[in-house]
Amino acid sequence: MDLVGVASPEPGTAAAWGPSKCPWAIPQNTISCSLADVMSEQLAKELQLEEEAAVFPEVAVAEGPFITGENIDTSSDLMLAQMLQMEYDREYDAQLRREEKKFNGDSKVSISFENYRKVHPYEDSDSSEDEVDWQDTRDDPYRPAKPVPTPKKGFIGKGKDITTKHDEVVCGRKNTARMENFAPEFQVGDGIGMDLKLSNHVFNALKQHAYSEERRSARLHEKKEHSTAEKAVDPKTRLLMYKMVNSGMLETITGCISTGKESVVFHAYGGSMEDEKEDSKVIPTECAIKVFKTTLNEFKNRDKYIKDDFRFKDRFSKLNPRKIIRMWAEKEMHNLARMQRAGIPCPTVVLLKKHILVMSFIGHDQVPAPKLKEVKLNSEEMKEAYYQTLHLMRQLYHECTLVHADLSEYNMLWHAGKVWLIDVSQSVEPTHPHGLEFLFRDCRNVSQFFQKGGVKEALSERELFNAVSGLNITADNEADFLAEIEALEKMNEDHVQKNGRKAASFLKDDGDPPLLYDE
């Protein structure tokens, strides 16, 4: 053995494993490997490992028991296999049900394949879409207690402890339990933990009321969708209000400011009305949107205000209920226009769209002007308000030829030191068959309010009626006064039927007080 290096055998010498054969008959030269080179390579490798150990210290690894095949937990694998098998079985059962349904068809006699199903005994509740809560409800306080049955003989107990089926306590508890059978919309309350007892009379009344409300809600379901009974905003009304905002006429609608029996008033900020005409209306900065309710529940008893009005008499009987409500809005628009021309403080009409009337807002910064009923006035301001009201009533009667017909402290606003009149949808002309009666009622409301307010100069209702109308009815009591008013109305109605409305005008050309009939 050569210590210097290991050399390959010469070409002529045969190797121990046999001569190497080359397919091209060319001998291969074996590269000689020196022992010194091998040792140098090993030394360099050791030095490299030492340097790496110095730069990257070895992290101590906690020694622990090696995981062997005996310690591996295979329960998850078993569960996975069971779940896969359950899915396969469910698919098989579903296919079996389809085959069963196809095999039976529409036959009245069917054959069941249930015995061939692959159902697991531990199949959980997830197999069905409807989850079932298997909690114990034996002690559930919200579960209605099972009533104690009464035997056929009709009583329980003996002697003094006998209890019949007509016992007040037993019947009261049974009636309380029966309230759970009412419709879900009927709120019966929560009686958990309380021993409630209802008498038969009370239970029967509640039962009848619940049934009647259920029938009523079912009957008015569709009508409610098309009415404005609640907040006066149905889908059609919302669409109209949306179009007003979308067109730019209104900038925004802030909210409701007043609610009444016949209408609801909303506050809105005015926009700009783009119109090619030069005389287009200027929209105020703040507007009031009056929406008339489209149900006739509140208008059935108020048709006398519009049925006998000559301006709408011919149109009233030809319209459906919804168009009658539009007529109310149109009537208020015309009345406000008359008052505006006469210079009476009132809202200015901006736009009328079906049963929606847009007017100027009386107030400031979304705060409406207070009513005379709500405002606190001193004696001088109250006296000034009375004289303004008296002047407005005379001006409304003579210059506008109108009677408010619902004038009271609730329909008069106090703003900027003046009295403003609102809500004139029911106002009629004095030629109305009941025009003078409405005027007398207005005088009564105004007189009583200011007399209670401490205005000593306030006239009585009969004196105020004569002062406003210009008539001189001398009657000692109210009954005779009303009788003369009805007689004048009857004579005026006959005169109108014979000679027409123009011949029975209340205003003379010479400015004298109005007359109900020609003398």
From Swiss-Prot:
Widely expressed. ATP binds at I257, S258, T259, G260, K261, E262, S263, V264, V265, K290. GO terms for molecular function: ATP binding; caspase binding; metal ion binding; protein serine kinase activity; protein serine/threonine kinase activity. The modification Phosphoserine is found at S8, S112, S125, S127, S128. Autophosphorylated (in vitro). CDD domains: RIO3_euk. It catalyses: L-seryl-[protein] + ATP = O-phospho-L-seryl-[protein] + ADP + H(+); L-threonyl-[protein] + ATP = O-phospho-L-threonyl-[protein] + ADP + H(+). Its main location: cytoplasm. The modification Phosphotyrosine is found at Y122. The active site is at D406. One of its GO terms (cellular component) is preribosome, small subunit precursor. InterPro entries: Kinase-like_dom_sf, RIO-type_Ser/Thr_kinase, RIO_dom, RIO_kinase, RIO_kinase_CS, Ser/Thr_kinase_Rio3. Changing K290A: Decreases autophosphorylation (in vitro); abolishes inhibition of TNF-alpha-induced NF-kappaB activation; no effect on interaction with IRF3; fails to activate IFN-beta promoter and IRF3 phosphorylation. Residues 121-159 are annotated as: Disordered. It is found in: Cytoplasm. PROSITE patterns: RIO1. It is an enzyme of class 2 (transferase). Keywords: Antiviral defense, ATP-binding, Cytoplasm, Immunity, Innate immunity, Kinase, Magnesium, Metal-binding, Nucleotide-binding, Phosphoprotein, Ribosome biogenesis, Serine/threonine-protein kinase, Transferase. Disulfide bonds: none annotated. Interacts with CASP10. Interacts with IRF3; RIOK3 probably mediates the interaction of TBK1 with IRF3. Associated with 40S pre-ribosomal particles. Belongs to the protein kinase superfamily. RIO-type Ser/Thr kinase family. This is Serine/threonine-protein kinase RIO3. It comes from Homo sapiens. The lineage of its organism: Eukaryota, Metazoa, Chordata, Craniata, Vertebrata.
